[in-house]
């Protein structure tokens, strides 16, 4: 069933981010703790924007949840570290054209895109962001502006999932980036990225419990938090038999 997402008109941060995306070319980093409406914002933008856009995410599950594609599949990225000194990613002499060999429709899509949305940005490595920047510059025929002049919307929470970096990859990336996180990408030294943090938690209504979750999130748990959590230890929950099913159709039956 198709659901229309209605924004909270009293939520100033939501409205500020919405106005920037809808009525300007300003790139935005939208963040906030769990349950503050990041996914709702993303869906609302996708449903209402008139801009030609694409929704991307670092993993298949995240891409499905966001209603988009993975970064690697959309840009045809290799899975090894995409280093700034790799000649295949050079802006000179058509090297990117030679390496990626996109189809004509895909090249046209990259050129005409106005808004690039990346969900779960906390899981995206810095080198991937820099590679996307170079690709968009080349296929937008705009080498001077970051991301080829495209508007970028990054959505996520750096307190949640981090980039997956294997041991040998970390050693390689450390030569070029202070951290593997997206915000260490070199392109962000050239772009005015506005950060907006959603504040209102919609998922939980118990303010005391929300405060405990905040303390866990920021690694500032105190004795009072532990005492409160321990009051729930040993609580009896009604048991029922679990039935493992392999398809949603079977579950519906």
For each feature predicted by the language model, list its residue ranges.
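Conserved ATP-binding/catalytic motifs of P-loop helicase motor domains
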Residues: 1-249
